[in-house]
């Protein structure tokens, strides 16, 4: 079978890469240990609901559903699996699951062993997870399996003339909860009709984050009564733009949470900033008020820090692509980003709603910021548009909960 051959080639490639690189080496080791973990830690008397996410982003989409089920149905235990180290390494101690491990490669032998040991009573695959052997085995055993926050496009293999056989895997799902009408219509063209348009659970997730945002006394003290600009996940090319403007505008304060927190990058930022600046890890209630720029030199705070800003900037738009715009928009503040945003649906929608703003360089940025700083009504209107966009698109979680039987 061609599919299995591709999987074995991929597995071989990862093992070879693991000889030279730490990330695939972690992956190989983690996949090898899965079966011992399941044998030793699975409670054979419990009923498990299994959630699978390829990586961290997909996990965050599934997280609202995990936490709702855990809250309303504590009689079930949660098994969370990841395919990549970038998800597993960050969330291996996630308290919302009873067991977190890797998902082994989709070979027939791995699949039989994994499903036998895990023995789930229900399964949720998040977004783009369509592992043929796993799905066929779960279907064969009569285990209801759902696709959550999935999205389909015409160029995917399922809708090509040569993908008819692979498209059969979509029929193994008990139901598909898709993000938009286009996905539902595409699936209908190949006869897949157990589909409901629910939207994207990421909107529910960022609302949860907003409601649970940490109080950060040092950031609050730093802000005081000043208009504060929060730059999240920034890269050097982003910082060249907004730091230049900040240096020339003493009426505003700046919080920078760089994407890469390294000594060399932090030194680069400090060299660019020409006003009093302090690192978060060195800040105290006494010295933080003397600074105009606060550099967040640790991880895990950004989603809570946006609440202290009047204007936000999301990095990556002058490089590989922008980062999470929803984490800022949920607080009802305008979101600025660079030009590499075309593949990010939320950014495109924010642009349409006038809550997001694209800048292609310093001149664009300066014109926009001058407008924000001189026109309070314009600033408030943009922030309201961003917040409304998130609120109006939330609700996927409730629709999913109504359609599953627990």
Language-model regions, residue ranges each:
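Nucleotide-activated sugar donor-binding and catalytic core shared by glycosyltransferases
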Residues: 1-406
